[in-house]
């Protein structure tokens, strides 16, 4: 190596300068290449940035448009929000009004619950009363059924008894009229016998003087006896009795409750006993209803007449009168029973009407109370 103080050759560069120049050239070349490459890269980046700028412009326009749309939506949403706030205020006022209505409804509900509790107690009490009334109605129906059965039985028994009594009365009347006919025939025969005896005695006493008056009285007595014999025959014609205007025609239940008949019935046994006493006494003279006032029979003839008179005729009559009085008493008892049954039926109908009215009143009473509680 040559130092700084050494002599140089003339016309030749030193080597270190050449190296430095080469180094500088290399560095500059490298720098140019590097700058060119960087310029290319920058151009590419610039182109890319330009494309990005275009895209951003497009995107910015799109975003501005979207922003405008969003602003329109925001305005619409703001308007909707204001509308909803107004609706909210209105709904809040309505809610307050509803709260007031709810409170009033709660108060009315409490009142209705109290009314319902009272009405349930009333309904329970009325149900108990209804059950009792049903039991009473069933019992009354059973009694009515029994009364109807008894009524039908009594009516049938009454019809049967009235029919039997009518038949017995007819038989007794026929027997009584036959007995009366027999008695009248017997009395006529006795009268004829007494007239013969009297005429014979008068003939013995007055053989020539008084025959004509006696003969006159005898036809008169015969005419009277014939009339008396014809009287009972008028009652029976062809085996059938003629019905009297005041009679019962064989039906004792049709008779009116005449107090005179009821008063006459107990006196019949006395008259019967009196007649029996008159008949059973042989010493007394029996009463002959059809004898003439001037004619009297002998005591023996009267005793025979008393023996031949059947003592049971008056007893049959009194028995028929007693049967009539018994039938009248039965008819009165049946009428009283029928009247009692009708009174019971009317009372039941009144009770049923009262029950219906009570139920209707309860229904009408419950309706306005429920309406007042709701209002």
Swiss-Prot record:
Its main location: membrane. Residues 34-375 are lumenal. It is found in: Membrane. The chain crosses the membrane at residues 13-33. GO terms for cellular component: membrane. Residues 34-198 form a coiled coil. It is a single-pass type II membrane protein. Residues 193-204, 350-375 have a biased composition (Basic and acidic residues). Keywords: Coiled coil, Membrane, Signal-anchor, Transmembrane, Transmembrane helix. Residues 1-12 are cytoplasmic. Residues 81-102, 193-327, 342-375 are annotated as: Disordered. Belongs to the GOLM family. This is Protein GOLM2. It comes from Gallus gallus (Chicken). The gene is GOLM2.
